[in-house]
Amino acid sequence: MSPLLRSICDITEIFNQYVSHDCDGAALTKKDLKNLLEREFGAVLRRPHDPKTVDLILELLDLDSNGRVDFNEFLLFIFKVAQACYYALGQATGLDEEKRARCDGKESLLQDRRQEEDQRRFEPRDRQLEEEPGQRRRQKRQEQERELAEGEEQSEKQERLEQRDRQRRDEELWRQRQEWQEREERRAEEEQLQSCKGHETEEFPDEEQLRRRELLELRRKGREEKQQQRRERQDRVFQEEEEKEWRKRETVLRKEEEKLQEEEPQRQRELQEEEEQLRKLERQELRRERQEEEQQQQRLRREQQLRRKQEEERREQQEERREQQERREQQEERREQQLRREQEERREQQLRREQEEERREQQLRREQEEERREQQLRREQQLRREQQLRREQQLRREQQLRREQQLRREQQLRREQQLRREQQLRREQEEERHEQKHEQERREQRLKREQEERRDWLKREEETERHEQERRKQQLKRDQEEERRERWLKLEEEERREQQERREQQLRREQEERREQRLKRQEEEERLQQRLRSEQQLRREQEERREQLLKREEEKRLEQERREQRLKREQEERRDQLLKREEERRQQRLKREQEERLEQRLKREEVERLEQEERREQRLKREEPEEERRQQLLKSEEQEERRQQQLRREQQERREQRLKREEEEERLEQRLKREHEEERREQELAEEEQEQARERIKSRIPKWQWQLESEADARQSKVYSRPRKQEGQRRRQEQEEKRRRRESELQWQEEERAHRQQQEEEQRRDFTWQWQAEEKSERGRQRLSARPPLREQRERQLRAEERQQREQRFLPEEEEKEQRRRQRREREKELQFLEEEEQLQRRERAQQLQEEEDGLQEDQERRRSQEQRRDQKWRWQLEEERKRRRHTLYAKPALQEQLRKEQQLLQEEEEELQREEREKRRRQEQERQYREEEQLQQEEEQLLREEREKRRRQERERQYRKDKKLQQKEEQLLGEEPEKRRRQEREKKYREEEELQQEEEQLLREEREKRRRQEWERQYRKKDELQQEEEQLLREEREKRRLQERERQYREEEELQQEEEQLLGEERETRRRQELERQYRKEEELQQEEEQLLREEPEKRRRQERERQCREEEELQQEEEQLLREEREKRRRQELERQYREEEEVQQEEEQLLREEPEKRRRQELERQYREEEELQQEEEQLLREEQEKRRQERERQYREEEELQRQKRKQRYRDEDQRSDLKWQWEPEKENAVRDNKVYCKGRENEQFRQLEDSQLRDRQSQQDLQHLLGEQQERDREQERRRWQQRDRHFPEEEQLEREEQKEAKRRDRKSQEEKQLLREEREEKRRRQETDRKFREEEQLLQEREEQPLRRQERDRKFREEELRHQEQGRKFLEEEQRLRRQERERKFLKEEQQLRCQEREQQLRQDRDRKFREEEQQLSRQERDRKFREEEQQVRRQERERKFLEEEQQLRQERHRKFREEEQLLQEREEQQLHRQERDRKFLEEEQQLRRQERDRKFREQELRSQEPERKFLEEEQQLHRQQRQRKFLQEEQQLRRQERGQQRRQDRDRKFREEEQLRQEREEQQLSRQERDRKFRLEEQKVRRQEQERKFMEDEQQLRRQEGQQQLRQERDRKFREDEQLLQEREEQQLHRQERDRKFLEEEPQLRRQEREQQLRHDRDRKFREEEQLLQEGEEQQLRRQERDRKFREEEQQLRRQERERKFLQEEQQLRRQELERKFREEEQLRQETEQEQLRRQERYRKILEEEQLRPEREEQQLRRQERDRKFREEEQLRQEREEQQLRSQESDRKFREEEQLRQEREEQQLRPQQRDGKYRWEEEQLQLEEQEQRLRQERDRQYRAEEQFATQEKSRREEQELWQEEEQKRRQERERKLREEHIRRQQKEEQRHRQVGEIKSQEGKGHGRLLEPGTHQFASVPVRSSPLYEYIQEQRSQYRP
């Protein structure tokens, strides 16, 4: 609503609020009006700055006579008040003064404008009826004021912009000044430092020097941050400028393109070439600029590192600083020289490339004139993509800037935290000084408090640990449940699929059998219509009955299937119930174990308390021996009581366990009994239903058929001597035995677990008692040994007292350490126990799966037996029918042949079924063996792990005891502080060794898991390959048989026709045929000789020509004898040949599809092998890196003299790596050649290569395992040597303290140097990775090109092989036909004699009939003439139509020929261009390889020049190797060129032959060529789409690379930050070494817990990742299997359809032949109609075929896209895993730095922790929860990514339909919106009209009411008739108000 309407509504609402309703209507009384004025007009009345308003109000009230105010009067009153108050309202409210004080003179116009607008709004309607000129003046004035205000606003905006520009300039000047000042300050500070280097130590104390250094460091850091900010701003400006330039260039290019389009095509081509050159140059320039920027950044980073190193060295030693400065300057100069040289070399290379590109471009201009049209579209697409890339880059840059800002903020916060921490440290130092005085008095109190607090803390920690363990267990349970459910679901799905497939196969077989039977029956009925009409009726009845029987059988089968499904469901429910029960049992067991563990912990706590009390007693023995005795007594009593309690609890627990087991066993027995009863009932019901169904069938079936079936059943019962009752009993017995076995196994497992638990508890108790006894014995020895002379005794007593005082501080800490160690051991045991439980669970699952598989196999065997019985019944019935037919037909020879054929088909089907069964059995056996092997491997690995863990634990315990003994001896001999240091160092070493061992174990486990996965995948793929090959072989055999049968049938039919139609000319034909066959054989021999030379397509052409010649000769002979018959036969033959060829083409296409699928699989396998090899290489590199790190650690322990040798060795290693990389470059082209050979040559060689690769992989794995074993042994030996050294040094400790300190300093220096070297190595590794990525991309592109080149070669080879196979089949068929022809001739002669006799008899009968019918014919002649005339007319019409169609077809043929000719020419041109491009790409590739080699050689040469001359022999060796490599490459290059030339020649020959063949076959294949052309166009379009998609994929890959680079930059920043932090830490450590040495024990102890927790979490995360990865792999495999199954189903369905069509065609052909023999007179008229119908049907069928083929081709790219997306997803997933691993490593490093910092904080805040420990615990708990949340978020993100990938795959197939739907939806929405807007407008107009009408009506009504009262209220006249009384209370109130405010 508008403000005016709101104000009107407010007025009406206010009036209604104060109105009093009476009989006269709604009106205001004086009281109501008083209230209204007081409340609403109070501000005007109380502070009337303008008294006119009050006077006007009083005047209006005086005029009122009634004392009542109507609504009209109220409105007039309000409008008058508004008119009076308009100019004085601001004064009344007190707002004018504030506005005037705030606003300037410029705002006066705006206020006037607003006032006028308000006046215009609130004017009444009566004022609107004034004169029009006044309104126009006001409008003009308002418009002028608006224009002025707008101008002022614009001027203000301009002023603001100018001010902003000025501010920016001032800021820039200020920044420049600041920079200049900072530079001057730096110089001054550096000069001061250089001048005061020697005097700083004397003049200033350490604290002042540290403060100055800290301030300098802070200033330096601030400057560096500012510099970084400036650089970032410069980068932004540079990027914006680049974008502007790009936009300008794009606009210029667009304009130029528009101009070129208007000009001639030649100019367009030239300009396009120039544009391409410009773009290439620009891209090259951009790449160069980016490279230069990266180099500059690297230089800056290096310079920063060097500066930081210089500062560190200055702090340590002045002399070393000078030397290092000189060295670094030299290094910088060398690096700069190297960079300059590299830049010069790059420039030279760029110039060379430009020259070469110019040459190439000149050649391209000559060659690629026709390609440019096609490239225009591609360029436009590239421009769009580049624009998209730029936009995405902008967004990423913005994101980078935001991240950098966040990082800076975090750095600032950390700095502030550092300052605060330093202040806290100082305060703590002061507090410690004050507190040291009071510590002696409060020690005892503190000890007590600390003990109590620690107990509380331990309890809380235990509670937290319990919660965490419970959560973990719940998670494990959930994961296990999910895995089980998924496995069950998968098994069920597989079973269902198998059942569906079997059902489909059964239905198809039944359908095929039915169709064959129907066809045979129809043939027999048509042949024997005249003689066997009575038999036909009987057969029809039999067929109907059989169909009924089949239907009933189908219904029975469906019912049986439903029952089986019900049984399966019930079995599934039972399994779920069993699983639930098992889960409940496990939960109960876990609860029991938890309770036992809790009790054990309590016991341990009690034991620990007892130990503590014993220690206290020992301390107090010297002072209070009586108390000690009492305590001992109490302790002994307490121990006895506790032991009794423990025994009682154990007994109770055992009783409860027994009771629970008995209850569970009873429940299981009851459930088993119920299940037995239910199964029996179900079986009985099923048997009853089957019997009822049999009785019904018997009642319906006639007696004779029932007798046949009963006889068949009797025979089957004789053959199969296994009745159903025996089978049911056997099943029940087997099930009972299986259940008993399960129960026994469960009981045995439970007993084993209980026994293990008891053994573990006994071992723990023995260990605790042994430990206590050993401690007591050691203390007794110490007391006995400590008895020297008196002086020494006194001194030792004093020392002992001091030690006691100090030990009292550290006793609780030591106790905590011991407790934690015990907890660790307990955790390890618990983990072992959990692992054992998991193993048992796995075994149980495996057993269950095996049992289920056995059950499934048994069910399958039963079903097979049932199916076999049914098939035997059906076959037996068929055989009986055939026997009857033989008896009825008196055993005719034609029927015998048919029976033979049927028998052969049945035999083939039986053989196929047997093969399938064998294959299934083999698969099942292979799977079972594989599972058994996996189980054995797992068990062996578990045993090995357990043994290793036991050994390690024993060694650790032994070492721990030795260390304790050594510590005690050292404490007796030596002082206090050095002893503590040694202990700390030993503990630190021990922990480091433990960590190293754990890391090694983790690495070994990961490697084993990887190997297992790889082996499993390899075995699985091998099996799949073998299965596929076997299936392919079977398919090929079936197809060959079918082809042979078709050819045989076709030839038999032709021979029968010829013999029946040409009985007289058989002898002539035989002679001529023999001659022709002899000639044909001679020609075939010549052809075979030519095939050996060429082996290509001319064979088919020649054969076709010869066959055509033979057929033409035969047709000429037949024309001489029977012209009419020959014409019809020719037509039929042509049609049949055309159909046969079409079928062959369809088969060829299907075979090509089937062949392409294994090729894809082979490619995938090759890619997989390549990836595996890359992974192996990466693993080898990792091993080498680990060896290098270990060697570096060993070298750091040596002196500086050994560093030079280390450098030389490192150089040698770098050379080796370069050589390896060179070898890799050499190996990769060799591998590519091998891949080509593999693809070109036969399958045998591929299999051999695969076997060789597998053998090599196995050898490599074995060698890696041996290396790892040797490395582990070497590491153990080194550790033992180090321990011995440490022991020797500890013995000579007092003499070697100074040496140790010096060694520590040297170790620190070496650590710094090693860190620097590590950074350099990381940079080198990153460079290597980048190179590898670029190489990998280049190789992928090359592989794609090679695959494109090899596709036509493969197709040609396949066609060649297929032709050779066809020739062989033809030869075999020809020989077989010759033999069959002889037999058939003999049979035909015999038949001919019989038929002659029959003809004679028929002629006699015909003569008699003719005499009788002659009279009847004379009458019918007239009718026949009429019919003939009609037929003649119809024939004429048909002839005319045929002529028209022929002309039309000829015209279409001509057009199509022209189109095809053009299309072929274009194809040839495209092929030539592609070949040229390939040649150029190969040349470029070789040129790049040579350039890379030159670069490497130059780099090696420069590196060698710097080295000593002692390495000359190595150089010579390398040169010889390089020469050999060059020779090999040249030789390979020549071989490749020769191969390419041969391929080109072969292609040219093939093209010439294809061209001739196409010219000959144009007339025959016109219709087919149209469809082929369409398919080819679609294929091109799809190829273009694929290219576009590939480009998009490459773009995504580039984006991923950019993200990786950014992450690497962030990593470098983090590393720098960590390095700074470490430097600060070192400074703090130098100050507080004494305090740190005292407090290291507590810190280390506190560190161990979070480390263990992290390790546990990491293990859990790794397990989860592995599990998810496996699940995804399984899903992918299932998806692939589903696709393969669907493809097989589709293929089978197509084959069946083809068979049915062929059978229908053959049936129709036979029907036509029979009709011709019987009805020769009516044959002419009907044949023409049949031909037409057949042509139409064939056209429809072809259309359907081509439609299906097109659909398949459309689906192919989608499937390929899905496969590519899956591969990309897998690749991304792997890359993400690698990135995650790197991030985790970085996190660990950062966590280590943070850990050190936290440790220092803990050391500083120990005293505060005593008061704030509960808060710290809560904080730790929160921190852990946050970490868990973060991990969960990461998991969710991963899941979301996976879900997105899956969603993308799912929606990829539906994108087209969605887009179309979206467009339609958008159009509909637009229409709907338009309609809605139109309706809203109409409604708005209607409402306005209605409101206006309503207002008019109200005014009219009110005017009428005023007339009724006798008054009219008009705006200019007297509104009120008489004067009111002045004595009203309201009048007095208003006068009082007036008197108050008047002067």
Swiss-Prot record:
The keyword Calcium applies. PROSITE patterns: EF_HAND_1 (PS00018), EF_HAND_2 (PS50222), S100_CABP (PS00303). One of its GO terms (biological process) is keratinization. Sequence repeats lie at residues 314-326, 327-339, 340-351, 352-364, 365-377, 378-383, 384-389, 390-395, 396-401, 402-407, 408-413, 414-419, 420-425, 906-935, 936-965, 966-995, 996-1025, 1026-1055, 1056-1085, 1086-1115, 1116-1145, 1146-1175, 1176-1204. Residues 314-377 are annotated as: 5 X 13 AA tandem repeats of R-R-E-Q-E-E-E-R-R-E-Q-Q-L. Residues 1292-1894 are annotated as: 23 X 26 AA approximate tandem repeats. Residues 110-164, 186-209, 222-274, 426-485, 509-546, 608-819, 837-872, 950-1000, 1046-1120, 1137-1162, 1193-1371, 1404-1435, 1492-1691, 1757-1820, 1834-1864, 1876-1928 are annotated as: Disordered. Residues 23-48, 49-84 form the EF-hand domain. Ca(2+) 1 binds at D32. Substrate of transglutaminase. Some 200 arginines are probably converted to citrullines by peptidylarginine deimidase. Residues 1-91 are annotated as: S-100-like. Residues 906-1204 are annotated as: 10 X 30 AA tandem repeats. Residues 1052-1064, 1142-1151 have a biased composition (Acidic residues). Residues 425-683 are annotated as: 9 X 28 AA approximate tandem repeats. Keywords: Calcium, Citrullination, Keratinization, Metal-binding, Repeat. Gene3D superfamilies: EF-hand (1.10.238.10). Residues 378-425 are annotated as: 8 X 6 AA tandem repeats of R-R-E-Q-Q-L. The keyword Magnesium does not apply. It is linked to Uncombable hair syndrome 3: A form of uncombable hair syndrome, a condition characterized by scalp hair that is impossible to comb due to the haphazard arrangement of the hair bundles. A characteristic morphologic feature is a triangular to reniform to heart shape on cross-sections, and a groove, canal or flattening along the entire length of the hair. Most individuals are affected early in childhood and the hair takes on a spun-glass appearance with the hair becoming dry, curly, glossy, lighter in color, and progressively uncombable. Belongs to the S100-fused protein family. Monomer. Consists of nine domains. Domain 1 contains two EF-hand calcium-binding domains. Domains 2-4, 6, and 8 are almost entirely alpha-helical, configured as a series of peptide repeats of varying regularity, and are thought to form a single-stranded alpha-helical rod stabilized by ionic interactions. Domain 6 is the most regular and may bind KIF directly by ionic interactions. Domains 5 and 7 are less well organized and may induce folds in the molecule. Domain 9 contains the C-terminus, conserved among different species. This is Trichohyalin. It comes from Homo sapiens.
